[in-house]
Amino acid sequence: MGKSDIKTLSEFVADLVELNNSERSRLSAILHEIQREYNYLPEQALRDIATLMEIPITDIYGVATFYTSFSLVPKGLHIVTVCMGTACHVRNSRGILDEICRFLGIGPGETTPDMAFSLETVNCLGACAMGPIMVVDGKYFGEMSSTKVRRILKKYQKEEAAAPAGAKRFSSAADLEKHRESVKPLRYSGGTSVYVCAGTGCQAGSSLDVLEAMRLELKSHGLDDKVLLRGTGCHGFCERGPLVVVGPENILYQKVTPEDVGEVVAETVKDGRVVERLLYEDPTSGLKFEHKDEVPFYAKQKRMILGPNGVLDPAEIDDYIARGGYAALAKALFDMDPEGIIDEVGRAGLRGRGGGGFPTADKWKSCRKARSVDGVKYVLCNADEGDPGAFMDRCLLEGNPHSVLEGMIIGAIAIGATHGYVYVRNEYPLAVKSISNAIAQAEEAGLLGMDILGSGFDFDVSVSRGSGAFVSGESTALMASIEGRVGEPREKYIHTAVRGLYVRPTNLNNVETWANVPLIINEGAEQYASVGTENSKGTKIFSLVGKITNTGLVEVPMGITLREIVYDIGGGIPG
């Protein structure tokens, strides 16, 4: 496409507007696509949108200038972003930024004269345990140093991931169960397996190179059809990444490089011997640990929600189905009524994991009782995780997106909702890709969309990307952003459960809350409520970053002390 051709640009915009049905709520998505194609928002494109969608040009400019992800001036071929969040700041992100500025000869917000590089900063990229972080065209590089900056920028090459496979379509709960039994032996055999962490944190340490090296090495030994190899979501122990776990003994190797892969395959996969030099060594006791669950970082955790992250390929819906995925949805559709679902969630004691800890069942009950003029209600997932040092939501969306999606569908059944949105930070490209892929797979499989599992229940979900405004994580600002308006909070004298998105009853929960729902429906309220304290049930996920020995993502029972988290799991404060 000739990007300087105004006619071609106008045609591109017209196609985008038509594809999005000229809906005001899709304005941000349209702007993102234009910027993806042209590296900025040309003035002509904004004028075309205003004409085609019959929106005042001032409103278009209002959205384009409010969100920091958008640019009205051309950007370079490669976008270099440096995290300046608290966790990266204490690890000298300022020095890294200065080095990039020296190397490129530009400052933040500027573009090199040859249009090769643009330099940007961001408050937090959610890979805090691997800081300081630099991102080039969406690829993360962690533990940056001046030497690494120069090496990466000199040799940078763009990488593209292969498109994931889909699944068959299920017309009933029985059909889903039949398929589950057929894929279990292939994806959950209990035999030899190799799990390579491919979450953002480990990707920053080049784990994708480790994964590819492992694939080639297994093939060279004729083991590619005998060993289950998975690129998984975040294992949590980000500071020691890239991580590789070899099953069924679950031997944990840390700081693995592509050069280590040959030894891991020859010694551990083939002969069952441990590669001592790659084991985790506790800095306090000097002890080395072979098995993942024995490592102090993991030993005191209770990974009810995060556990599957270490074994699932998030791009494969059959991995999720093989381990019980969407069984809770089938149960909610055919064995429970909406009131029963809400009652189960209430007896489990689930509270919101993203804000004030409001009882989830009470929230759902209010939204179910609320009247809608046309019967339309919404459920929303708030994944606009902007707090510095926080990356809990990112890891869940990247590593186990179907659990979040399944929770949302169950919530929609309980509330009587017809549409859902996942609002994700634009600074989380892997999370956006992961949840978008999960939605497409679920639709293809008959688990989302019209007549889910032949039940007659209809529900669809869309992804709405944030555009760099921290305030858009606030509930009413988030809804304004989805509607295509400037993401500013409104007065809260009217609850969003009564009058929310598009002035319809709306239920908003965060990523972690939704991920708890399938667990409750599958295992029952009593089992779930047996974890935690009398008033706070279940577990809570925390990002453990900054000046601490073991940084990463932890999941612990409610009621645990901060001292236990910092010292027993985190290994204490260095020095």
Language-model segments: residues:
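Feature of Fe-S/electron-transfer and energy-metabolism proteins
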Residues: 1-575
